[in-house]
UniProtKB/Swiss-Prot annotation:
Organism: Arabidopsis thaliana
Biased composition (Polar residues): 419-428
Function description: Malate transporter.
UniProt keyword annotation of Ion transport present: yes
Residues in coiled coil: 445-472
Official protein name in the record: Aluminum-activated malate transporter 14
Amino acid sequence: MSDRVHERSMGMEEEGSTKNMKTKVLELPTKIKKILKNIWKVGKDDPRRVKHALKVGVSLTLVSLLYLMEPLFKGIGNSAIWAVMTVVVVLEFSAGATLCKGLNRGLGTLIAGSLAFFIEFVANDSGKIFRAIFIGAAVFIIGALITYLRFIPYIKKNYDYGMLIFLLTFNLITVSSYRVDTVIKIAHERFYTIAMGVGICLLMSLLVFPIWSGEDLHKSTVAKLQGLSYSIEACVNEYFEEEEKDEETSDLSEDTIYNGYKTVLDSKSADEALAMYASWEPRHTRHCHRFPWKHYVKVGSVLRQFGYTVVALHGCLKTEIQTPRPLRGLFKDPCVRLAGEICKVLSELAASIRNRRHCSPEILSDSLQVALQDLNTAIKSQPKLFLGSSQNGNVSQGNSGRHNPNVAVSQHINKDTNEAASYQNTGTPRGERMSRFGPNVSFSRLRADTLERRSAAATNERKILRQQLSRIVVLTSLEFSEALPFAAFASLLVEMVARLDNVIEEVEELGTIACFKDYDNNVDQKDVEVRVEKPADLVVGVE
């Protein structure tokens, strides 16, 4: 009997495994299609990735000729593999990143080789023991010094890779020279092949479809301004829609408002990396000054501070307690006009940076001040919504707290508190107390029993009050609580107007340092009235 049960269970397991295998085989085409779709999407989002991949392939093919062609191999030898390794390590997505790594690797190798040659020259005529001690001391001092220097922020940011290559090359040559006599010759050959690899990387990065980090940083700043403008307009339009939308999925990647300000919040590390790589690129202004890439980082920091208010504004759409839509409609026109003026300013700033010109002198027009004043007037015209209505309170009291939860809660608290106080004073009925203690009860026993009853009554009272106070927080006046969410929404719009000054100031300072052209009212008039559109996704290649 047990054998049959075992065979049956084995058969069921085999049948289940067969079904799972068939399911996986049937799902295989779908998975392959999904992978191919993702690969296609990567290239479609940024076609420069395809160009970079082709450049890497061509560079590796060129350095491989040092191994494949016999005349070149005889002249260089096995050190040709270092050229291949250099291309793999140095060739980056942007020209600035390639220059940074290439020059760091080249200079680090050259300086380390020169220092190792000097140490070899000094220790060559000494005895074997003294030479070993001298090499060991040099390795210790140089290793400790270079490692300590790597902790300096400026060196860590700009020359960390070069310091690492220097330390590696120096130890490789210095330590190997103690046992190998031809180590200097090998070092020369490796330096030549590394120089060949770096040269090929620089030629491919600077001359063949160059990708500039500075241009990426410039475009990303414009895209961030456009993204904030789009998010603000979309938030206000959705907040004042007459019909409520269906519940959306929790996937934030599909939220267009979130995608508008997401790049701003996540831009700190990308901006700093792009600014550093751009500082290595041979790009100058028309006055032959270095372009102020670091000031783009400051603009990004100010935009992040401004973006936090957009995040809070978006959060007003997701709160559990919402102002009724008829009540929102009372303030729709001034809010929409104010948001439109804010978006207009952001769009003008984006056009200013995109065209490398100063902002319009009338960027903060009277329309913004008028829209702000209209919103203030609209709010003051409805004081009962924000300060509460005494009439509503009287009606609620007349209906025994049915319409005003505070009254019912207060009555319930008073009732429970009176009951607790009654228990505290009496504890038990008078007759029961007298029969319980009797005429001969001692004073100490009576005092202890009284303290015990008071402690129990105080504990019960605290429990009652805590429960009822938590209800008071939630069950506030209905009319007052409905106006609170809109008050938060309106205050965030006003806060945006206040923070616009900081954004305008930083953009104008950037234009002054970068020598932007002056604003021409005739030429740039078409850029003043900018329509707010969803910004195109900018893919920045930072590795």
